[in-house]
From Swiss-Prot:
Catalytic activity: a 2'-deoxyribonucleoside 5'-phosphate + H2O = a 2'-deoxyribonucleoside + phosphate
Binding site for substrate: R18, W19, H33, D69, D77, L78, P79, T80, D137
Function, in words: Catalyzes the strictly specific dephosphorylation of 2'-deoxyribonucleoside 5'-monophosphates.
Alphabetized CDD domains for the sequence: HDc
Record GO terms (molecular function): 5'-deoxynucleotidase activity; metal ion binding; nucleotide binding
Organism per entry: Escherichia coli O127:H6 (strain E2348/69 / EPEC)
Family: Belongs to the 5DNU family.
Residue ranges constituting the HD domain according to the UniProt record: 30-142
Swiss-Prot/TrEMBL site (Appears to be important in orienting the phosphate for catalysis) positions: R18
Name the record gives this protein: 5'-deoxynucleotidase YfbR
Keyword set, alphabetical order: Cytoplasm, Hydrolase, Metal-binding, Nucleotide-binding
Length: 199
């Protein structure tokens, strides 16, 4: 059997730090970010289904979110101000992402490619799936800002403001629910969030 470097590459996502141009109280890597986005995306899909009459596959949404930044193992995490400096750069970066996604799919053994390609290639996502993953991605970036600000790092003030505008643009009923029910706890200390459930 032919060897595949697919998972060896993906394991290196933990070596790619996010927010590279900003001072961080705690560094966040792409691997841990992807896990958090998967958990939040799954929650958004579940909320949409249970509370607002949605009919999406929450488990698939979690998988899509888990792989949503996989191509960054080949491209790196380009800082947002660079990525969206102008429309031409944004377009070219999208093209580079597409090539990187295909390169990752090509690493997968041929008999498994039909399983992994729809998870890695964002063009295989439905509009609804893409929307939920993007909502979760923005929410997790926003939560990172809250954590940094709570630790006294004002470097994230402008990023928080920018992300609030992004969240408003992507606003949905499931996001409103998540923001109301889960986000306030991110402003609290460990002692405060542990009071109601001591071991």
């Amino acid at each position: 059997m032919k060897q595949s470097h697919f998972f060896a590459h993906l394991s290196r996502l933990k070596l790619i730090n996010r927010w590279p141009l900003m001072r961080n109280v705690r560094t966040e890597n792409v691997s841990e970010h992807s896990l958090q986005v998967a958990m939040v995306a799954h929650a958004l899909a579940a909320i949409k289904n249970r509370k607002f009459g949605g009919n999406v596959n929450a488990e698939r949404i979690a998988l899509l979110a888990m792989y949503h930044d996989a191509s960054e193992v080949l491209t790196g995490d380009l800082p947002t101000p660079v990525k969206y400096f102008n429309s031409q750069i944004a377009k070219e970066y999208k093209a580079i992402e597409k090539i990187a996604q295909q390169k990752l799919v090509d690493m997968v053994p041929e008999e498994l490619q039909d399983i992994f390609a729809p998870l890695i290639d964002e063009h295989a996502y439905s509009d609804e799936e893409k929307s939920l993953v993007k909502q979760a991605d923005a929410l997790c970036a926003y939560l990172k800002c809250l954590e940094e600000l709570a630790a006294g790092n004002n470097e994230f003030l402008l990023a928080k403001t920018r992300l609030e505008a992004t969240l408003e643009a992507r606003r949905s009923q499931e996001m409103d629910y998540f923001m109301e029910v889960f986000v306030p706890s991110f402003h609290l200390s460990l002692d405060e969030i542990s009071q109601d459930s001591p071991l």
